[in-house]
Amino acid sequence: MGAARSLATNEGAELVRRCRAGDGAAWEEIVQTYSRRVYNLAYRFTSRADTAEDLTQDVFVRVYRSLEQYNPKQGDLQNWLMRLARNLIIDDYRKRQRAPQDEIADDLEDHKYHLRSAGNSVQREMERRELGAQVQAGIDKLSADLRTCVILRDIEELSYQEIVDLLRIPEGTVKSRINRGRIELAKILRRMRVVEG
């Protein structure tokens, strides 16, 4: 693991060095390598594809502007980039919580789009999407600290150490938040009658 991490750190440092020198291909490689992960994280916090896309773009603008601050001695590129992403996404989430907007029309349009999607089993796809939406609604009800840890561990599949590095909190705190978040999510889903209890 140490050798793999060292290799990842060296590769990330080299990509950043090339970007700083004006190599567009290096920047494109960074974006292609990490954009899906950033988008997934943004989507888990926003539950909206358009907002997640906007946040993903914002993250990469910030990353590009912050390349001079990247120091491979403090961790690999992925951890640094995902820490920037997490901070920006959490900040956006907090702003939206303070100033909620009426998004019913947008949600209705999304629903119409999903109903038009074709497939062999429309019913099964609708059930899968509904279950996914219900689970996401349950995740949205968790406190920010619990939600962040649950998303990073159970959805983004980061290791405990990666979460520790990303959030800069002790491993015991990470494990506690994940456990409490899972328990709370199960209670929420039972109340929503998503799972039997």
Predicted regions and their residues:
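N-terminal module of bacterial RNA polymerase sigma factors
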Residues: 1-37, 123, 140, 187, ...
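Acidic, proline/glycine-rich intrinsically disordered inter-domain spacer in sigma factors
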Residues: 2-3, 10, 110-137
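Amphipathic, Lys/Arg- and hydrophobic-enriched alpha-helical face
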Residues: 31-49, 66, 82, 139, ...
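Σ70-family region 2.3-2.4 aromatic/basic alpha-helix that recognizes the −10 promoter
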Residues: 35, 43, 57-64, 74-95
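Arg/Lys-rich amphipathic alpha helix in sigma70-family domain 2
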Residues: 65-69, 83-104, 180, 191
